[in-house]
């Protein structure tokens, strides 16, 4: 069995692809994989480190306004589709999967034109431009949020969830908090704004640290590499207690997520898949800098089901974040209700469901 996968730009498109690959390997250890991405995207680094064969094409995204740059993008798309056809003819895959991002546009389009079975995976509650375009040509569209189903033909939709969810379930959490100077068994809040951090989130947390210093519950505050040194200098005079740990980055996130009580974070699709798979309540601060405001839409889906509290970045300045954290951690009934609601939304079987959908179009 040969499988070609394309998706990239951000981890939200790459990590689901890798989770799918690992799941399929369990059923078909003999399967061969080829990942098609760009050299500039995150996938070039992550996929190569996984030891998966990698080919690259050049592509950029469309501007949402009239622009001469879009003419260049069309030319790059056509060139990328031509190169993709050649790569696919050489590799001869049995199926081609797109997990989002601009790069999968020419790849999946080329596969469909070559009559190779195709499936795209939409992680968000708002369909991306690339997936909307590709859905006209693909055999199936795998989704994670019911809210996005109106964007695609109903006969093509299969609800799988995000395969990344399957990778955090059952992970051993022993020693996870101790590795960052915290105690296991104590209520702990994890705050993070993505791999690079988020300035708005950081500013809100910095403002409440003097108050947090008086609380009993622990804080694992992940600033992001870019902001760490500056924040570390700012906090030097606060004399923070040992129950507050400030870190630039977390490399063992699945372990940590299994050990914490509450998460304060952005609302990327992969993060939400992980939180709901584990039943972790959250305070979500969606990034306002993403296409079609999809993070807020993702977050509202959890809020509607009582699995999260949503605070937009615009609301942060007038919101007492400390009081919001207190309202959850000091109310056991509320905390447990949010846990149960998050768990109910989770799709820990998502990777297996996606594999099933892919194998189904190969028959």
Swiss-Prot record:
GO terms for biological process: carbohydrate metabolic process; cell division; cell wall organization; lipid glycosylation; peptidoglycan biosynthetic process; regulation of cell shape. CDD domains: GT28_MurG. InterPro entries: GlcNAc_MurG, Glyco_trans_28_C, GlycoTrans_28_N. It is found in: Cell membrane. GO terms for molecular function: UDP-N-acetyl-D-glucosamine:N-acetylmuramoyl-L-alanyl-D-glutamyl-meso-2,6-diaminopimelyl-D-alanyl-D-alanine-diphosphoundecaprenol 4-beta-N-acetylglucosaminlytransferase activity; undecaprenyldiphospho-muramoylpentapeptide beta-N-acetylglucosaminyltransferase activity. Its EC number is 2.4.1.227. It comes from the Bacteria. Keywords: Cell cycle, Cell division, Cell membrane, Cell shape, Cell wall biogenesis/degradation, Glycosyltransferase, Membrane, Peptidoglycan synthesis, Transferase. It is an enzyme of class 2 (transferase). The keyword Cell wall biogenesis/degradation applies. One of its GO terms (cellular component) is plasma membrane. It holds the Pfam family Glyco_transf_28. It catalyses: di-trans,octa-cis-undecaprenyl diphospho-N-acetyl-alpha-D-muramoyl-L-alanyl-D-glutamyl-meso-2,6-diaminopimeloyl-D-alanyl-D-alanine + UDP-N-acetyl-alpha-D-glucosamine = di-trans,octa-cis-undecaprenyl diphospho-[N-acetyl-alpha-D-glucosaminyl-(1->4)]-N-acetyl-alpha-D-muramoyl-L-alanyl-D-glutamyl-meso-2,6-diaminopimeloyl-D-alanyl-D-alanine + UDP + H(+). It is a peripheral membrane protein. UDP-N-acetyl-alpha-D-glucosamine binds at residues 10-12, 124, 195, 250, 295. Cell wall formation. Catalyzes the transfer of a GlcNAc subunit on undecaprenyl-pyrophosphoryl-MurNAc-pentapeptide (lipid intermediate I) to form undecaprenyl-pyrophosphoryl-MurNAc-(pentapeptide)GlcNAc (lipid intermediate II). HAMAP family: MurG. This is UDP-N-acetylglucosamine--N-acetylmuramyl-(pentapeptide) pyrophosphoryl-undecaprenol N-acetylglucosamine transferase. It comes from Listeria welshimeri serovar 6b (strain ATCC 35897 / DSM 20650 / CCUG 15529 / CIP 8149 / NCTC 11857 / SLCC 5334 / V8). The lineage of its organism: Bacteria, Bacillati, Bacillota, Bacilli, Bacillales. The gene is murG.
């Amino acid at each position: 069995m040969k499988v070609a996968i394309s998706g990239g730009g951000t981890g939200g498109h790459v990590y689901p692809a890798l989770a799918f690959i690992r799941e399929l390997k369990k059923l078909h250890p003999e399967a061969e994989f080829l990942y098609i991405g760009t050299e500039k995207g995150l996938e070039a680094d992550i996929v190569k480190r996984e030891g998966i064969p990698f080919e690259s094409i050049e592509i950029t995204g469309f501007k949402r306004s009239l622009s001469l740059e879009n003419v260049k993008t069309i030319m790059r798309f056509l060139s990328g589709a031509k190169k993709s056809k050649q790569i696919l003819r050489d590799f001869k895959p049995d199926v081609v999967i797109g997990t989002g991002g601009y790069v999968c546009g020419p790849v999946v389009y080329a596969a469909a034109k070559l009559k190779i079975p195709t499936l795209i995976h939409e992680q968000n509650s708002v369909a991306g431009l690339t997936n909307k375009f590709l859905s006209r040509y693909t055999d199936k569209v795998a989704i994670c949020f019911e809210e996005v189903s109106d964007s695609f033909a109903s006969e093509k939709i299969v609800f799988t969830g995000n395969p990344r969810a399957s990778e955090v379930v059952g992970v051993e959490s022993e020693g996870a908090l101790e590795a960052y100077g915290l105690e296991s068994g104590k209520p702990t809040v994890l705050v993070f704004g993505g791999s690079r951090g988020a300035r708005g989130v950081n500013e809100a947390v910095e403002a409440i640290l003097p108050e947090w210093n008086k609380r009993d519950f622990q804080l694992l505050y992940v600033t992001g590499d870019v902001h760490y040194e500056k924040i570390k200098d700012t906090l030097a005079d606060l004399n923070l207690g040992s129950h507050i740990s400030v870190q630039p980055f977390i490399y063992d996130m699945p372990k940590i997520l299994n050990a914490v009580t509450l998460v304060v974070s952005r609302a990327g699709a992969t993060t939400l898949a992980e939180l709901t798979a584990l039943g972790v309540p959250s305070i979500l601060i969606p990034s306002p800098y993403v296409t079609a405001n999809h993070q807020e839409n993702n977050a509202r889906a959890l809020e509607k089901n009582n699995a999260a509290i949503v605070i937009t970045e615009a609301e942060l300045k007038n919101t007492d974040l400390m009081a919001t954290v207190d309202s959850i951690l000091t109310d056991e009934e509320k905390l447990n209700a949010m846990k149960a609601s998050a768990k109910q939304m989770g799709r820990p079987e998502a990777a297996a469901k996606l594999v099933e959908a892919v194998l189904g179009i190969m028959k």
